[in-house]
Regions:
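Basic, polyanion-binding surface patches
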Residues: 1-167
């Protein structure tokens, strides 16, 4: 049997970006922090994210027809922490604009992808949500926030010589 805590540590060796995924349901914004975001295809442009089915926000995302993935910048660690918690008060004082589909695009994000939801696949205690990108925004000058080994990090370029020394 696999020990959950050991598996979590091993999976934590994979560095990821940090996102806040948003949707709008019945005139209210819903959002949560996720690092389980990845591209699926460029044609058609498709992405996916995973969400725990026990999360309070899962019901909203299950019924939503669209969502936006906000890729957080390195200055948005507190935003990541805030959206990792439950409760409606997490939107208090948050600066955002609504995209063409009504979802929140967070001010200061490194990138944002507005998607029509294509499919939701429930697996174990999570759901995989696939979306087709309808529009995107990016600010290349913003450094993305990274999460690895249970810590926030900044990406750092590795020179060819340094990389060779590690292999």
């Amino acid at each position: 049997m696999i020990a959950t805590s050991d598996l979590r540590k091993a999976l934590g060796c994979f560095a990821t970006g940090v996102t806040v995924i948003t949707t709008r349901i019945a005139e209210r914004q819903v959002g949560f922090t996720a690092n389980s975001f990845t591209s699926v295809s460029l044609s058609p442009p498709t992405i996916l994210f995973c969400i725990g089915t026990a999360r309070a926000s899962y019901v909203a995302f299950r019924s939503a027809t669209s969502f936006t993935v906000n890729v957080l910048s390195s200055s948005q660690r507190t935003l990541s922490d805030r959206f990792a918690t439950s409760g409606d008060d997490k939107w208090q004082g948050i600066e955002f604009v609504e995209d063409a589909l009504g979802n929140a695009v967070l001010a200061g994000a490194a990138a944002a992808f507005t998607c029509h939801k294509r499919n939701t696949i429930e697996e174990a205690d999570h759901a995989i949500v696939l979306g087709e990108i309808m529009e995107f925004r990016q600010c290349p000058e913003r450094v993305p926030l990274v999460y690895c080994q249970s810590r926030y990090c900044l990406p750092k370029e590795v020179s060819g010589d340094a990389f060779m020394a590690l292999t």
